Amino acid sequence: LDTWSYVQQFGKDKLRGVVTIDMSPLPLSPDPKWWTEGTIEELSQVATQVLTSSQGCREFFSEYATGVMIQHKMKPDELEYLLDISGRTPYWICRQLFCDAVFSNYLEIAKDVGATLPSLMFIAEHWQGIAKPFVEAQLPGYDTYVMGGHLMFYEYPEKWNRVLEDFLDKL
């Protein structure tokens, strides 16, 4: 989302290519065929009932880290490391960042980017069944690469960097 936000704010003039990681340009949609972050009800619950305290944020990130972000079974110290990093952001800012992401709509910008710049979308394996067809249909200019969980660059740095370097070498 940050890449598309940058393009919205500053344009594409200084860009030679775009890489995005495992996020739909339209994270919230009532259409079940679209790649979203969850149902409207699920996302509403997270925003209004979960991310309302430090403890709620910690529990959310713990569940998200073990279920979505990382594929391997983490040891307690690795999970604690990730929770410590996320816990440095106050819960009210986490909530605002979550809502800002969920309610964003960069679909038209993402389409334009894919049509005019070399573009690579990394997709987490757990999303590939819906995300890959979504990107192929809605963002046909994007190359896609499926690997890992949401934190694929953390969990598989050599493989991720190799794919990134191959993309950058073509620019």
Predicted regions and their residues:
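Flexible "cap/lid" loop of the alpha/beta hydrolase fold
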Residues: 4-53
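Catalytic active-site module of serine/aspartate enzymes centered on a nucleophile-bearing elbow/loop
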Residues: 140-171
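A structural preference for long, well-packed, hydrophobic secondary-structure segments
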Residues: 1-8, 13, 26-27, 59-73, ...
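Conserved alpha/beta-hydrolase catalytic His-Asp/Glu region
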Residues: 29-38, 50-112
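Alpha-helical elements of Rossmann-like donor-binding domains used by nucleotide-donor carbohydrate transfer enzymes
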Residues: 2-5, 63, 81, 96-100, ...
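Conserved serine/cysteine hydrolase catalytic core
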Residues: 87-147, 153
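Nucleotide-sugar donor-binding loop of glycosyltransferases
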Residues: 22, 125, 156
